[in-house]
Amino acid sequence: DQQAITATRVKGGWRFDGHAPWATSWGIADLFAVAAESKAGEVVWGLIPGTASGSVRPTSLPLPVFSATGTVALDFDGCVVADEKVIGVEQLNAWRLTDQRRASIGQPAVLGVAERAIRLLRAAQHDEHDPAGPTADALSDELASTWEQDDAVLTALSDPSSTSVALGAASAHRASCLALAHRSTTALLAAVGGGGMDLSHPAQRLAREAMFYVIQAQTADGR
């Protein structure tokens, strides 16, 4: 495995070294906020220009979804971030807890994908004997219940005193949302047949979106 980005204190700033496997909007955004870990257990946030250099090397990533987003991997080799470009330094453990909470709050995008797929699945029903109808009904009932759970999870995590139990419940809920989106988009593809694989058809796009959300803001609990 390639080493994550490390931050080493140097005169006038911090030196960043290591590998970032995922950076979006390269070639689009002017500045990027990069996080690196120091030996003292800190997370150091610094701003770097969105251009390649001898110390920052991008590698394009061919992706099945969001290919127009300019997503690359970045390798840092002695990239010095001046003190005036450092936007924050915080303890790693505190940052991890905050990041996990943020990543676990609310799954409206995932559930939106499921909702759209279910609506299209219902529209694809040929007659009253088509299994797409009962499948859409069952998925729709599950979606309604999941939306209610989403509200409850959001309420629990919004409490500053929320515990690891609440975070665990949120991770489990997120997994349920992802599974629902995948089952809904797969059912839609099965119902519409081979035409659903055409790039102009929403079925394949929704299936790819559901796949993307599996890795977006992924946490260890989520894996």
Annotate each PLM feature.
Residues 68-71, 102-113, 138:
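Short, contiguous, pocket-lining structural segments
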Residues 1-28:
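Glycine-rich flavin
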Residues 194-223:
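Glycine-rich phosphate/cofactor-binding loops in nucleotide/flavin-utilizing enzymes
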Residues 52-80, 91-94:
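Flexible, small-/acidic-enriched active-site or ligand-binding loops
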Residues 126, 144-182, 186-198:
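C-terminal helix-coil-helix/basic helical segment that borders enzyme active sites and/or dimer interfaces
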Residues 77-104, 118-132, 151-155:
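A glycine-rich, basic-preceded beta-loop-alpha segment at the flavin cofactor/substrate interface
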Residues 106-110, 135-146, 173-177, 206:
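Amphipathic alpha-helix face/heptad-repeat signature
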Residues 22-56:
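A short core secondary-structure module
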